[in-house]
Amino acid sequence: MSSGKIAQVVGPVVDVMFASGDKLPEINNALIVYKDSDKKQKIVLEVALELGDGMVRTIAMESTDGLTRGLEVLDTGRAISVPVGKETLGRVFNVLGETIDLEEPFAEDVDRQPIHKKAPSFDELSTSSEILETGIKVIDLLAPYLKGGKVGLFGGAGVGKTVLIQELIHNIAQEHGGISVFTGVGERTREGNDLYWEMKESGVIEKTAMVFGQMNEPPGARMRVALTGLTIAEYFRDVEGQDVLLFIDNIFRFTQAGSEVSALLGRMPSAVGYQPTLATEMGQLQERITSTQKGSVTSIQAIYVPADDYTDPAPATAFAHLDSTTNLERKLTQMGIYPAVDPLASSSRALSPEIVGEEHYAVATEVQRVLQRYRELQDIIAILGMDELSDEEKTLVGRARRIQFFLSQNFNVAEQFTGLPGSYVPVAETVRGFKEILEGKYDHLPEDAFRSVGPIEDVIKKAEKMGF
């Protein structure tokens, strides 16, 4: 094990000098430095660049407070490796695989795997055309998710990405019954804590591994924690042949952490100040999140959109890798429609008659047509009023508004805030409900009866309570 000495510390970036005759550590190798003489407080560094003349530049996975020039640094000879397998289920740990749930740490002999790996080769890949039912009407109808597919939840600040991902965990992890891996990347610690206790209460935690590198962590940890979660998911897929659900909240923070580190590594910034290696880093992560002939990984990723600008390089780069996109729209939150999913901007390659069936496809496309026409008529209504519309257009507007409200739904995870019980709506019920609205069966019911309900029967009950 070769050793060197700290030459420079600049925030999370540490330069290490190795003696001229020593073998330099390889890129992505983990180095260890002890802050105290008792060797109790260690910091893990990851090699990012070789600068020449025996100097390497590293990124710290923990705070560099207390590091001084001249401290000894040891090369472990391998990449950061984390625990994998059944022992990780029901546990919470950090980027290095150290437990943070106040329970017993992992045994020394637990299986470990390096976080840096190659993506599966082309001939190992497998595709599926099976739909993953979420129980959320707007998603199941207009942008259905594929088993083994990649899903992106796009939205600006405060539009409901984390609540939606928590509802998906509640619905899918409980219905799916398989193994789930939740990776918190640079998000709020409070949300992670709430999620942990909710999962513990519901019993879902027994089949879930949770990995966190939250907002308060240094950028090195936030940059690598997604790979830690992915390594655990890959083990369940490849070694145990399982179908795995991988939740990542938030993939933008992965890019943001890379951007923070990039300038300190001496790279010239690219568009909007992002790192020049943005597309490569995103590709290396996303290409590993895939399904093989041994098992599948269905990934659901929350993606923050800075200033609601979808042309920003970070969300735009992520778009290219996804099968389904669920776009959250701020205007809908202002109208009190939750989940605030934009039915026209969201898309899925699964929405085709071959995959979802003729009836589902016909109802979904008609819903989109009606909503698109309503959007076009809104300018006329705003300027001239409803009276200028033809009878046919007035009927269409009425149905479009009912559809828009019926796309909203109460969530189980939001019950403590709204006081309203959450609902899980099977796909067949969703399709039937929208088909009947399009046929005009409920034109006589008030629009408010369609707001924040589950299946169409809830609308009828709500309307009866309102005196209709």
UniProtKB/Swiss-Prot annotation:
It is a peripheral membrane protein. ATP binds at residues 155-162. InterPro entries: AAA+_ATPase, ATP-synt_VA_C, ATP_synth_F1_bsu, ATPase_a/bsu_AS, ATPase_alpha/beta_chains, ATPase_F1/V1/A1_a/bsu_N, ATPase_F1/V1/A1_a/bsu_N_sf, ATPase_F1/V1/A1_a/bsu_nucl-bd. SMART domains: AAA. It comes from the Bacteria. GO terms for molecular function: ATP binding; ATP hydrolysis activity; proton-transporting ATP synthase activity, rotational mechanism. It catalyses: ATP + H2O + 4 H(+)(in) = ADP + phosphate + 5 H(+)(out). GO terms for cellular component: plasma membrane; proton-transporting ATP synthase complex. SUPFAM superfamilies: C-terminal domain of alpha and beta subunits of F1 ATP synthase, N-terminal domain of alpha and beta subunits of F1 ATP synthase, P-loop containing nucleoside triphosphate hydrolases. Its EC number is 7.1.2.2. It is an enzyme of class 7 (translocase). It is found in: Cell membrane. Belongs to the ATPase alpha/beta chains family. Produces ATP from ADP in the presence of a proton gradient across the membrane. The catalytic sites are hosted primarily by the beta subunits. F-type ATPases have 2 components, CF(1) - the catalytic core - and CF(0) - the membrane proton channel. CF(1) has five subunits: alpha(3), beta(3), gamma(1), delta(1), epsilon(1). CF(0) has three main subunits: a(1), b(2) and c(9-12). The alpha and beta chains form an alternating ring which encloses part of the gamma chain. CF(1) is attached to CF(0) by a central stalk formed by the gamma and epsilon chains, while a peripheral stalk is formed by the delta and b chains. This is ATP synthase subunit beta. The gene is atpD.
